[in-house]
UniProtKB/Swiss-Prot annotation:
GO molecular-function term, one example from the UniProt record: metalloendopeptidase activity
PANTHER family reported in the protein's UniProt record: ADAM A DISINTEGRIN AND METALLOPROTEASE DOMAIN (PTHR11905), DISINTEGRIN AND METALLOPROTEINASE DOMAIN-CONTAINING PROTEIN 5 (PTHR11905:SF28)
Cytoplasmic-facing ranges: 671-709
Transmembrane domains' residue ranges: 650-670
Boundaries of every Disintegrin domain copy: 346-434
Gene name in the database record: Adam5
InterPro entries listed in its UniProt record: ADAM_Cys-rich, Disintegrin_CS, Disintegrin_dom, Disintegrin_dom_sf, EGF-like_dom, MetalloPept_cat_dom_sf, Peptidase_M12B, Reprolysin_adamalysin
Pfam families: ADAM_CR (PF08516), Disintegrin (PF00200), Reprolysin (PF01421)
GO cellular component, one term: cell surface
Membrane protein topology class: Single-pass membrane protein
Keywords on record: Disulfide bond, EGF-like domain, Membrane, Transmembrane, Transmembrane helix
Protein name: Disintegrin and metalloproteinase domain-containing protein 5
Disulfide-bonded cysteines: C247-C329, C289-C314, C291-C296, C406-C426, C585-C597, C591-C603, C605-C614
Length: 709
């Protein structure tokens, strides 16, 4: 039973510093319907609403929140923890806070339990001789995981896939808050919910269940560490894994059992302890291990205790050593590469970039583009100048009119941009959204480029070189050497087109290219070539790069097609539905099938169709982002988005309004003329003439008179 300590929490009542997300850009969830049909959905919409941090004013606190649909998560202070959830019967940012407690859950004593003794233990003798080093030597690392939820846990958590998914995200989010001292982040690569039935046999013994799950993992999730979250009402242990071997592909799985009545916070601690043991940490020795708080994370007491928990000095030393062992699953963070701290922004007049406190920047004194308008020494506008630099600033020192081209299209995935009539600088670059077909349906647009292997080979080796056949790619990328690999290992069959770039070599001479070595292979009718760019391969990879984002031009680029509706991403072949978010922009629904979605998730319309919804309007085209003027139909009037109404449409509008008005006035004038002639004739005959106005006036007088009586 949740004990409310505060029934209402306003959104501005909690100050929180939020940090990075932990859902990968290609993360996906899998569920099963009543017919046992599997459905997949991208988690990209949840990527930027799951965060970790702390309560402002309470440095020794921890917060893990998801704000995707209301505020959900956990808040920890020194010795107490609270859960927070939205009140579904109330509207607005109103939430319930309750203290996290375990409802008489029977949790095995990890201090005495030998769950892991059936596996080979690591040799930890190095710790006694290891010199303690400063915490600053640790650098950010991440572990990618595939999470699986069994049928019983799905039912225990409410039998609602949306709610269960949110709870899984909460668990991983809370784990990341505890791992923050180790600078370690657990990333969610996928979440599979066995909502219909379990996909494997469930033996009673956890170690036997682990063997069953490993077979499933090797078949369906071979790339990353896999975790099975399973419900057992009264388990004999907390789970199963191979201690210290989790980073080895053959042993890369773990089972975490969820007892009845356990809080989500306590279960998160169980999952964290299992993961820590899996990478090589051990339980703490109470006599020699110490932590900043009352409870250390790698102790049995941590599962029962509320409040902030921390890794001990023993765990820190162990992890420092493990981080030097080039464990395959401990990778450098791809989204937060170690960069130099950005220097304080300062103005540099003459660099051609408009910066703070500058009115203009036309370049150096010698190369100033607008000498009549801008002083290149002070970056100030000259007298009477409206602008002094920029693509849309004319030599007359005035902003160019709307519809003037300011940036040409580079390729079929890139769009033209126009001056909007208001700004001296061209609008931001617009291009087709990632995943849009190009090259007659043979490739995909990615980051504004049409990603074809032909173009990549031509850019690397010259205009006569083309991309190789699948047979060449398969031959080279299965070699598992520096000329054929997927960075850290050989490419599996399905990823063959996403590793090293393989091209056809049409020449009879050998390649002579600085800092490049080449391997050749005659495969069927083609002479194929693969390149290696200088340097000695790292210990943990088959290249000179440890991070996917740093790989050189001898690797296939992200976005390259690798099958029907498939694209390469970080040397893996993925389905395009994980790349494209159709909820934000859909060409059929939003663009009327007469345009494509751009990088702002707005429609870029074909010629003859008007943005934003690509409705048929003669002469219109483009998007609301490219700077050109377009029209929005409001009722019966057309209103221009940027600057006034087009002269041609102004004339049409004038005619539409004035012609009916002239006709009405003419009709009234003709009617009055006829009445005047009729009255003139009747007066000459001595009869009275009563017009509509006179009748109306007579009635009004009579009514007023009767009112006075």
């Amino acid at each position: 039973m949740k004990t409310p300590i505060s029934s209402i929490l306003k959104s501005n009542g909690l100050g929180i510093f939020l940090y990075r997300s932990f859902i990968t850009s290609t993360a996906v969830s899998y569920t099963y319907d009543r017919q046992d049909v599997r459905h997949s959905q991208s988690l990209s919409s949840l990527k930027n609403c799951n965060y970790n941090g702390y309560v402002a004013g309470f440095p020794n606190s921890i917060v893990s929140l998801t704000v995707c649909s209301g505020l959900r998560g956990m808040i920890q202070f020194e010795n107490v923890s609270y859960g927070i959830e939205p009140v579904e019967t109330l509207s607005g940012f109103i939430h319930v806070i309750y203290e996290n407690t375990n409802q008489q859950a029977k949790i095995p004593d990890l201090g005495e339990n030998q769950t892991y003794s059936w596996s080979d233990e690591l040799d930890y003798q190095f710790r006694s001789n290891m010199k303690k080093s400063g915490f600053a030597v640790l650098r950010p690392r991440y572990i990618k995981t595939d999470i699986v939820v069994d049928k019983k846990l799905f039912d225990y958590m409410g039998s609602d896939t949306r709610v269960v998914l949110q709870k899984v995200i909460q668990i991983i989010g809370f784990i990341n808050t505890m791992f923050s001292k180790l600078k370690l982040t657990v990333l969610i690569n996928s979440v599979e919910i066995w909502s219909k039935e379990n996909r494997i046999d469930f033996p009673e013994a956890p170690e036997n269940l682990l063997v069953q799950f490993l077979h499933w993992k090797h078949k369906y999730r071979p790339q990353h560490i896999s975790y099975l979250l399973a419900f057992v009402e009264h388990p004999a242990s907390t789970g199963a894994l191979y201690p210290g071997n989790l980073c080895k592909p053959i042993y890369g799985a773990a089972i975490a059992l969820y007892p009845k009545g356990l809080s989500l916070e306590s279960y998160s601690v169980i999952v964290l302890q299992l993961l820590s043991i899996g990478i090589g940490l051990t339980y703490d020795n109470a006599d020699s291990c110490h932590c900043t708080g009352d409870v250390c994370l790698m102790t049995p007491k941590a599962i029962y205790s509320g409040g902030v928990k921390d890794f001990s000095t023993c765990s820190l030393d162990d992890f420092k050593y493990l981080s030097t062992q080039d464990l395959e699953c401990l990778q450098d963070l791809p989204m937060e590469r170690q960069k130099k701290k950005p220097s304080r922004p300062r103005r540099i007049c003459g660099n051609g970039i408009l910066e703070m406190n500058e009115q203009c920047d036309c370049g150096t004194l010698k190369n100033c583009t607008h000498k009549k308008c801008c002083d290149p020494m002070s970056c100030r506008l000259k007298s009477k100048a409206v602008c002094g630099s920029g693509e849309c600033c004319g030599q007359d020192c005035k902003v160019k009119p709307v519809n003037v081209l300011c940036r040409k299209s580079k390729n079929e995935c890139d769009f033209e941009e126009y001056c909007n009539g208001n700004d001296a600088y061209c609008v931001p670059d617009t291009f087709a959204r990632n995943g849009q077909y190009c090259d007659s349906g043979q490739a995909f647009c990615y980051s504004g480029l049409c990603m074809t292997s032909n173009n990549q080979c031509m850019n690397l080796l010259g205009k006569y070189v083309r991309g190789a056949s699948f047979a060449c790619y398969e031959e080279f990328n299965s070699r598992n050497d520096r000329f054929g690999n997927c960075i850290r290992k050989f490419c599996s069959f399905e990823n063959s087109l996403c590793g090293k770039l393989v091209c056809t070599w049409p020449f009879k001479r050998l390649l002579m290219k600085d800092n490049m070595s080449a391997a050749y292979g005659q495969i069927r009718d083609d002479l194929c070539i693969s390149l290696y760019k200088g340097g000695r391969p790292l210990k943990t990879t088959l290249s000179t790069y440890s991070d996917m984002s740093e790989r050189d031009e001898t690797f296939v680029k992200d976005g390259t097609i690798c099958g029907p509706d498939m694209f390469c991403l970080e040397t893996q072949c993925k389905e395009t539905r994980f790349l494209v978010d159709f909820q934000q922009c859909n060409t059929s629904r939003d663009c009327n099938d007469h345009g494509v979605c751009n990088n702002f998730n707005h429609c870029h319309c074909d010629k003859g169709y008007n943005p934003p919804y690509c409705e048929s309007v003669k002469g219109q085209f483009g998007s609301i982002d490219d700077g050109h003027k377009y029209y929005i139909d409001e009722g019966k009037s057309a209103k221009q988005q940027n600057r006034g109404i087009h002269p041609k449409q102004q004339l049409q509008l004038i005619l539409y309004i004035t012609l009916p008005l002239i006709m009405i006035i003419s009709a009234v004038f003709i009617k009055q003329s006829k009445l005047s002639r009729l009255c003139g004739r009747e007066r000459s005959e001595g009869t009275s003439c009563i017009t509509e106005d006179s009748v109306s006036n007579t009635k009004m007088t009579t009514n007023e008179g009767s009112t006075l009586h």
